[in-house]
């Protein structure tokens, strides 16, 4: 008896054959109605149905896709076996045979026995009278549950073995696969996780699994239904796919997106995208060792869950035996990210806590981590930190002494708390977008809440109050206007608090450039140069003013455009290119003082002046500031409070 294979054909040259040779098998499968997007249309030989126009009612037994010859039914048997088991089939421990699994297997879904047992028991508990539903309804509920399960854990393997070693082979399918990761290989690593429309400039690479082996697919022609930022764990169905050197060549005709996602993989993908899209951080670390971007991305994706210990990828050729996290790490490893990653880091712990890793642990432990949060998280943290700071100042001042001498310090602390707390309540949701990280460390304030002894309680209280404001209070209240430089975090905090009352704030920042995000000057009257600047407290985007750029280049943007527009090489063209090259080297080597202005008209802080290096005057001012701070701290008697 000739065996029959059920196939999904999406090729345009085979649709005409299906219109003339479709039998009742396709109609029977479509009657299940599990998902409108994956109703198969099968074709069989013409001798099985001499009248193509007539529908043949075929029972569910006859459409089971089997391998090998079925065992003949005894002639004296009046009742056929509803779901026969054929001797040619090798039933493994993970296979699960039931009418429901047969329905999903015809669509290209093969799942493990453990998943079926768990899913059916859960549905019987959650859905009333689930056991009385027909096979189609039960299969529909199981399919809905499957869409949000991780095939790395529940997949039984629907692909033929050793796909990675195949070449010039067409796999008929259909195969339902889970997409763990999508990257745009038409861009460098920094741009691979940015959304891009389907077109000739985009080439997606998909890391997919059927639960047993990892396969990769390439977007051979633009597929509009696939997106770079699609959720991890997306389910797709492929059929009649060409394999070239182990790579699935994906075209729109053979790919259909079903949907779904896996929550754990999606959270890891989001953390990875945030890490990759962060601005450059420069090359400064404690020991001068800078981890690669792929290493940082891997740690960002899988080092935040302290409960997942020991999950790693054990690569055995084409087969992957791991958990969901391991397969996702394997997915990233094929994009240049290390394979063996153990997730042991807890997000609530300090960032300098050592991370556990099998391959990159030695490197990562030497890295100075710099956490850069989003603007919304910054707003909430700033609000809470300001309140905790003001409350600590109030407690510190209240312990300095009693009587009229302490009342001045306490009232000053209360006014500071009310001022900062009230303004921060209104400004929490309006924190400037370019501020990515701002920490107000309250630990040092709490250290000053010990008892202070001295002969003059009033003088000590006033001196103590000044010290607290100098350490932790914002520079808004500082009376020293002759500072050698300030910090971006401090200046950003000042602008966030006072932008409703003043038009702009300025500050001198000692910093260096870590990269250039955008430089435009053609066909416009001004330069637009957006740089990444790091001053040790914050990394943010700063816009260099047109006058600053024009002063360094020596020509306006229109003059540069006119000199570079000539196709023939001239002396003016060569001179302009040389000046632009010198300006590029100046930006690459810049480390000095910037005068930064924050105002309402600009989205970014504007650098209105920049000077290479640090002057001797600034060094003397900084030295005097350090000496005055040391004299203030030395006038207080250090008291060590030992716990009982």
From Swiss-Prot:
Disruption phenotype: sterile due to extensive chromosome breakage in meiosis I. Keywords: Meiosis. Residues 28-51 have a biased composition (Polar residues). The keyword Hydrolase does not apply. Residues 1-54 are annotated as: Disordered. GO terms for biological process: resolution of meiotic recombination intermediates. One of its GO terms (molecular function) is nucleotide binding. It holds the Pfam family RMI1_N_N. Component of the RMI complex, containing at least TOP3A and RMI1. The RMI complex interacts with RECQL4A. PANTHER family: RECQ-MEDIATED GENOME INSTABILITY PROTEIN 1, RECQ-MEDIATED GENOME INSTABILITY PROTEIN 1 RMI1. Essential component of the RMI complex, a complex that plays an important role in the resolution step of homologous recombination, in a process called Holliday Junction dissolution, to limit DNA crossover formation in cells. Together with TOP3A, is essential for the resolution of meiotic recombination intermediates, a step that prevents entanglement of the parental chromosomes. Belongs to the RMI1 family. This is RecQ-mediated genome instability protein 1. It comes from Arabidopsis thaliana (Mouse-ear cress). The lineage of its organism: Eukaryota, Viridiplantae, Streptophyta, Embryophyta, Tracheophyta. The gene is RMI1.
């Amino acid at each position: 008896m000739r065996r029959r294979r059920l196939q999904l054909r999406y090729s345009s040259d085979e649709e005409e054959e299906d219109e003339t040779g479709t039998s009742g098998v396709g109609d029977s499968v479509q009657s299940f109605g599990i998902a409108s997007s994956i109703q198969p249309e099968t074709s069989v030989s013409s001798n099985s149905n001499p009248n193509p126009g007539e529908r043949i009612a075929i029972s569910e037994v006859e459409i089971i896709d089997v391998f090998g010859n079925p065992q003949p039914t005894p002639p004296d048997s009046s009742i056929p076996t509803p779901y026969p088991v054929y001797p040619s089939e090798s039933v493994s421990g993970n296979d699960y045979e039931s009418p429901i699994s047969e329905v999903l297997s015809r669509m290209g879904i093969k799942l493990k026995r453990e998943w079926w047992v768990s899913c059916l028991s859960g549905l019987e508990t959650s859905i009333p009278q689930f056991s009385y539903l027909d096979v189609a309804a039960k299969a529909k509920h199981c399919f809905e549950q499957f869409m949000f399960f991780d095939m790395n854990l529940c997949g039984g393997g629907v692909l033929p073995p050793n796909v990675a070693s195949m070449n010039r082979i067409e796999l008929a399918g259909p195969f339902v696969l889970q997409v763990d990761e999508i990257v745009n290989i038409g861009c460098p690593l920094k741009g691979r996780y940015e959304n891009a429309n389907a077109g000739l400039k985009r080439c997606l690479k998909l890391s997919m699994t059927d639960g047993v082996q990892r396969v990769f697919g390439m977007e051979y022609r633009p597929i509009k239904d696939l997106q770079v930022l699609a959720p991890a764990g997306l389910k797709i169905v492929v059929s009649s796919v060409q394999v070239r050197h182990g790579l699935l060549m994906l075209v729109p005709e053979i790919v259909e997106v079903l949907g779904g996602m896996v929550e754990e993989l999606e959270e890891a993908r989001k953390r990875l995208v945030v890490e990759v899209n962060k601005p450059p951080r420069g090359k400064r670390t404690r020991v001068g060792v800078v981890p690669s971007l792929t290493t940082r991305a891997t740690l960002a994706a899988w080092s935040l869950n302290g409960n997942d210990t020991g999950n790693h990828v054990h690569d055995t050729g084409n087969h992957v035996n791991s958990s969901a996290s391991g397969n996702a790490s394997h997915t990233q490893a094929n994009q240049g990210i290390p394979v063996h990653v153990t997730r042991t880091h807890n997000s609530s712990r300090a960032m300098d806590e050592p991370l556990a890793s099998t391959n990159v642990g030695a490197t990562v432990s030497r890295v100075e981590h710099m956490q850069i949060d989003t603007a919304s998280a910054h707003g909430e943290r700033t609000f809470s930190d300001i309140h905790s700071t003001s409350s600590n100042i109030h407690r510190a001042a209240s312990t300095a002494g009693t009587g009229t001498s302490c009342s001045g310090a306490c009232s000053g602390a209360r006014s500071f708390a009310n001022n900062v707390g009230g303004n921060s309540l209104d400004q929490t949701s309006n924190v400037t977008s370019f501020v990515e990280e701002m920490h107000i460390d309250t630990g040092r304030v709490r250290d000053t809440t010990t008892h202070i002894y001295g002969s003059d309680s009033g003088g000590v209280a006033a001196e103590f109050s000044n010290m607290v404001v100098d350490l932790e209070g914002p520079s808004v209240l500082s009376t020293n206007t002759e500072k050698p430089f300030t910090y971006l975090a401090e200046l950003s905090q000042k602008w966030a608090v006072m932008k409703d009352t003043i038009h702009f704030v300025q500050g001198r920042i000692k910093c260096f450039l870590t990269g250039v995000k955008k430089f435009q000057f053609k066909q416009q009257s001004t330069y637009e140069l957006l740089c990444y600047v790091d001053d040790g407290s914050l990394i943010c985007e700063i816009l260099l003013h047109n006058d600053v750029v024009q002063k360094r280049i020596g020509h306006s943007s229109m003059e540069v455009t006119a000199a570079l527009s000539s196709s023939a090489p001239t002396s003016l063209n060569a001179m302009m290119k040389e000046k632009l090259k010198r300006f590029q080297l100046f930006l690459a080597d810049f480390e000095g003082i910037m005068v930064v202005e924050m105002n309402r008209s600009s989205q970014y802080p504007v650098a209105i002046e920049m000077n290479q290096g640090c002057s001797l005057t600034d060094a003397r001012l900084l030295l005097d500031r350090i000496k005055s701070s040391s004299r203030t701290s030395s006038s207080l008697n250090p008291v060590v409070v030992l716990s009982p």
